[in-house]
Each structure stands twice: as structure tokens, then as C-alpha cells.
């Protein structure tokens, strides 16, 4: 389920390249396209610029042109990658470089080794180019037949990546190592989300996590259905009871001895969502294998934090269930007793993600972390409010803003949203403590309001510890790309928010 065959990533001088293709950047300046590299010999650069008009080069985002190698450049193929508009100083943004690297590498599938001479003269720029290249070198073929995989071998992702940079090895190597680790984490999420629900369900998801982390310092603890029942995880059990594949709760932990802080992460892991008795229309189920993207993200972030040896304790909680209709499934009007004791009236069985997440939020905050962030493909309302590329971020103001800032630094799109107090009234139940469904309008924020009720909900009343800061990331839109690939983002699973959360955790170490 999780592919371990990722591309290698090294820094090279131009004269030492072994690649068969070299990527250079072209931006859009006020007077036309601008070549963005100092690595090429002057004659080669002049010849390239002279070809722009003939080739129709504009330097637009995702624009890729190929042409034969030039004298003084030790590769047989040159690739011009558009980075889009430049700033007032004639520079491309880090995200533009990341996107250009990804688009170029993605277009070169079938090429064994690719070098990139995009601007990489600072650690931030080098990181952007390296990350984009790694993320662009992705394909999911694990469930094709051997024959089909062999036929597709000519278009397999790039296996070797070389980045041309003037930085010394002491400065470049740590940047490239981080890019490789974070890129691998993003691609691990893509692998899991792209896996068919016939193969990935709660038990196999838990097994895949345990197997992947077996040789790492990350500890893994799995609750099966018997342990969940014995310990009172009523929400996870209720959502999973309609399926012949029982639910799981997985706790993973990176616990360095010198931890500067403790961050808890909670991920929604509905391995397939039919809607349950409140059945979805057939067309709405077509992407519902991706409803576990939040749990996959949490797994990948903890994995990356451990691989990078970040001095922050990180606990990840993966709430795994399959939401199916059957004679044993929960019904609208059922009442669930949750972990921690709160009761929930089920008004709609298709509002199931918040129920499994609530159990996990209680468990996570019982451990008194310094902050808890949850990640979920939670609501269709997120797409209505923010579209398919922005993550909605809600919660306590300071942590919400910290998450949005981390997303901005990582080059991911996120938008902070309010949680008005009046939304709580729409979740009132006449028979239980709270309903799992509120009013139609503001559905993304109402779902987050439901989750907020379970932060610290399992603590005894005499526990006078400060309330745990909490933020909620709704990735329903950006977690799965149903449109054409762009930049470093492929079709289908994207791995969104891994880079954001790794950056946020690293920030806590500082």
C-alpha cells in the first residue's frame, strides 16, 4: 500500500551532471519571458533566449517546452519550465519554483534522471525546487497487473533528481534530506488514499501503519473492536457497526527525550463512506475511498517528524471505520454514548466523520498536549465555501492563525474561518447532549463546532489544567484532485497539509 521506491535527490554542479534532461526556469516579466538561471554558459543562455519567440515561450505557470541540448550544456535534452509572474525584483516566489519543478519532472515521466537548474541559491529556494521535483515524480501503479505495469514502464516517474545549486554541501545536504523526507511523507499519503477500499479498510490500514513504522522509533498502539468496546469508544464503534469490517483506533507516537513541546494530531479515517442509512447518491460515492485522507495525513506527519528527529513529542490518533448500510448500522435518531461520557443524537448517518473524530479528540486531550490539531475530509460545505484547493482552518484563534501561517510558509493554500458561538444552538438535541447535525448554512463551521465540544471532554471536573488549544483543518476539497494534474499536484490523492503540519511542528521546536 505504501510504496518505498522514491527518487534519489542530490546536489550537483553543472559540469558534474549525469542526467539526460536539464530543467531551467522561465518567468513572465513586464517585457516578456525571462530566463531564470545563472548556471548555463553565456552562449547557451543567449541561444535559449533567442528561441523563445519561435517556441512560443511565455513563462506561464505549468508551461513546459522541450528542445535539444546546446553546446556547453552536458545533457541531450533541455526543458523550459514556466514559473509565472515575477516580482518587482524579477524574482520568482518559492511556491512558483516548487510548482515549476513539479510540472517539469511530471512531464518527464519515462526519463531515468533529471537535473534542475531553477534558481536554488538560497536554502528556501533549494527546498522549494527539491520538494517540487520529488512531488512531481509520483505515480500510483500498485494495483495494476504486472503486465500493465510493464507496459507503463516507459512512462514511470523519474528515479534520479539532481539539483544545480551554488550552495556548499554543508548547507545543501540538510535541505535536500528534509525535502526527501517530507516528499516521501506526502507520497505515502497519496499511496494510502489512492488504494482501493477493497484493499484498504480499518484492519489493513492499521496493519499498514504498524508495518511501515516497525523499524522506526515511532511507537504504535492499536485498539481492535473488543478493546474499543471495553474502553467505551462508542462513537467509533457506532459508525463502524454497519460494516463487516470492524473499526480500529491507532495511536502512534514520536517521543524524543529532549522534546520541547507536545503536539497531538487527530485524523479522520473513514476508509469508505456510503453515507450509511442516510445513503449518498451513487455519484457522490465515487471518491469516497479518500475519506480517510485525514488519518493518512496524521500518520505521515508523525512519520516525518520522527525521520527528521524533530525535538517535539507528537502523538497521532487515527480513527478508522467503514460507514456502511446494513441491518446492524446506526439509524437516524439513535443515541450514542461517546468516549468520555457525552451522548450524541444521530440525525444523519452521513455526518459520521465528526463522530469518530470526537472519540479520538477526547482520548488525545486526556494526555494534556500543548495543542491538538485535527485533520479531516469533513464536509461538502468546505468545498462550497472555499473551493477545491483551499483548506479551511477553524478553532482557537492563535492556533488557527499559526496553522494558516505554516501553510503559507509551506506553499499550501489555507484560509482561517470563524466559529461563531451561535452555531452551537443548531446542534441542540432534545434527547441527548448534542446532535451530530446542525443547520444547512455554515455547515463547515457547524461541524467544527461539534468537534470543539469534545476537546478536553474526558477530563474529570476537578481537573484544573488549562484548556487545550485546538484547531481543525477541513481538507475535503484539496485532498483529492478530480481535475487535471497541475504543478506538483497529480490527479487523485494530493497529500495536502503534510508539509504544513511538519512545518508547524518544527516551529514549536524553535
UniProtKB/Swiss-Prot annotation:
One of its GO terms (biological process) is proteolysis. The keyword Manganese applies. Its EC number is 3.4.11.1, 3.4.11.10. Keywords: Aminopeptidase, Cytoplasm, Hydrolase, Manganese, Metal-binding, Protease. PROSITE patterns: CYTOSOL_AP. One of its GO terms (cellular component) is cytoplasm. Binds 2 manganese ions per subunit. It catalyses: Release of an N-terminal amino acid, Xaa-|-Yaa-, in which Xaa is preferably Leu, but may be other amino acids including Pro although not Arg or Lys, and Yaa may be Pro. Amino acid amides and methyl esters are also readily hydrolyzed, but rates on arylamides are exceedingly low; Release of an N-terminal amino acid, preferentially leucine, but not glutamic or aspartic acids. One of its GO terms (molecular function) is metalloaminopeptidase activity. Pfam families: Peptidase_M17, Peptidase_M17_N. The active site is at residues 280, 354. Mn(2+) 2 binds at residues 268, 273, 291, 352. Belongs to the peptidase M17 family. Presumably involved in the processing and regular turnover of intracellular proteins. Catalyzes the removal of unsubstituted N-terminal amino acids from various peptides. This is Probable cytosol aminopeptidase. It comes from Micrococcus luteus (strain ATCC 4698 / DSM 20030 / JCM 1464 / CCM 169 / CCUG 5858 / IAM 1056 / NBRC 3333 / NCIMB 9278 / NCTC 2665 / VKM Ac-2230) (Micrococcus lysodeikticus). The gene is pepA.
Amino acid at each position: 500500500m505504501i510504496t518505498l521506491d522514491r527518487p534519489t535527490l542530490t546536489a550537483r554542479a553543472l559540469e558534474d551532471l549525469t542526467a539526460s534532461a536539464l530543467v531551467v526556469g522561465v518567468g513572465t516579466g513586464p517585457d516578456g519571458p525571462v530566463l531564470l538561471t545563472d548556471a548555463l554558459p553565456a552562449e547557451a543562455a543567449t541561444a535559449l533566449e533567442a528561441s523563445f519567440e519561435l517556441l512560443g515561450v511565455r513563462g506561464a505557470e505549468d508551461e513546459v517546452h522541450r528542445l535539444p541540448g546546446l553546446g556547453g550544456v552536458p545533457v541531450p535534452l533541455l526543458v523550459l519550465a514556466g514559473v509565472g509572474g515575477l516580482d518587482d525584483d524579477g524574482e520568482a516566489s518559492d511556491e512558483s519554483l516548487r510548482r515549476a519543478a513539479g510540472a517539469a519532472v511530471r512531464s518527464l515521466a519515462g526519463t531515468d534522471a533529471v537535473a534542475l537548474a531553477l534558481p536554488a541559491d538560497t536554502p528556501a529556494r533549494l527546498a522549494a525546487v527539491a520538494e517540487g521535483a520529488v512531488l512531481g515524480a509520483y505515480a500510483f501503479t500498485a494495483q495494476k497487473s504486472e503486465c500493465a505495469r510493464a507496459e507503463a514502464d516507459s512512462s514511470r516517474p523519474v528515479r534520479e533528481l539532481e539539483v544545480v545549486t551554488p550552495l556548499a554541501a554543508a548547507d545543501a545536504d540538510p535541505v535536500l534530506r528534509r525535502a526527501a523526507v517530507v516528499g516521501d511523507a506526502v507520497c505515502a499519503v497519496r499511496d494510502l488514499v489512492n488504494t482501493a477500499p477493497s484493499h484498504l479498510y480499518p484492519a489493513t490500514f492499521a496493519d499498514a501503519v504498524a508495518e511501515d513504522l516497525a523499524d522506526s522509533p515511532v511507537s504504535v498502539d492499536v485498539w481492535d473492536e473488543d478493546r474499543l468496546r471495553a474502553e467505551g469508544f462508542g462513537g467509533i464503534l457506532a459508525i463502524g457497526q454497519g460494516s463487516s469490517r470492524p473499526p480500529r483506533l491507532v495511536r502512534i507516537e514520536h517521543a524524543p527525550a529532549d522534546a520541547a513541546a507536545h503536539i497531538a494530531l487527530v485524523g479522520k479515517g473513514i476508509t469508505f463512506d456510503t453515507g450509511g442509512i442516510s445513503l449518498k447518491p451513487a455519484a457522490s460515492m465515487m471518491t469516497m475511498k479518500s475519506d480517510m485522507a485525514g488519518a493518512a495525513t496524521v500518520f505521515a506527519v508523525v512519520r516525518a517528524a520522527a525521520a527528521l528527529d524533530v525535538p517535539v513529542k507528537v502523538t497521532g490518533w487515527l480513527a478508522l471505520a467503514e460507514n456502511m448500510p446494513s441491518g446492524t448500522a446506526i439509524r437516524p435518531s439513535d443515541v450514542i454514548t461517546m468516549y468520555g461520557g457525552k451522548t450524541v443524537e444521530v440525525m444523519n448517518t452521513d455526518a459520521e466523520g465528526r463522530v469518530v473524530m470526537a472519540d479520538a479528540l477526547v482520548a488525545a486531550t486526556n494526555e494534556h498536549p500543548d495543542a491538538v490539531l485535527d485533520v479531516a475530509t469533513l464536509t461538502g460545505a468546505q468545498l462550497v465555501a472555499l473551493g477545491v484547493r483551499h483548506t479551511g482552518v477553524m478553532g482557537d484563534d492563535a492556533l488557527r492563525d499559526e496553522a494558516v501561517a505554516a501553510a503559507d510558509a509551506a506553499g499550501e493554500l489555507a484560509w482561517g474561518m470563524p466559529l461563531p458561538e451561535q452555531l452551537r444552538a443548531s446542534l441542540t438535541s432534545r434527547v441527548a447532549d448534542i446532535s451530530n447535525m446542525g443547520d444547512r448554512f455554515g455547515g463547515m463551521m457547524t461541524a467544527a463546532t461539534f468537534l470543539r465540544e469534545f476537546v478536553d471532554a474526558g477530563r474529570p471536573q476537578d481537573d484544573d489544567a488549562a484548556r487545550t488549544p485546538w484547531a481543525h483543518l477541513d481538507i475535503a476539497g484539496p485532498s483529492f484532485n478530480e481535475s487535471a494534474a497541475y504543478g506538483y499536484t497529480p490527479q487523485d490523492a494530493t497529500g495536502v497539509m503534510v508539509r504544513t503540519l511538519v512545518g508547524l511542528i518544527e516551529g514549536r521546536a524553535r
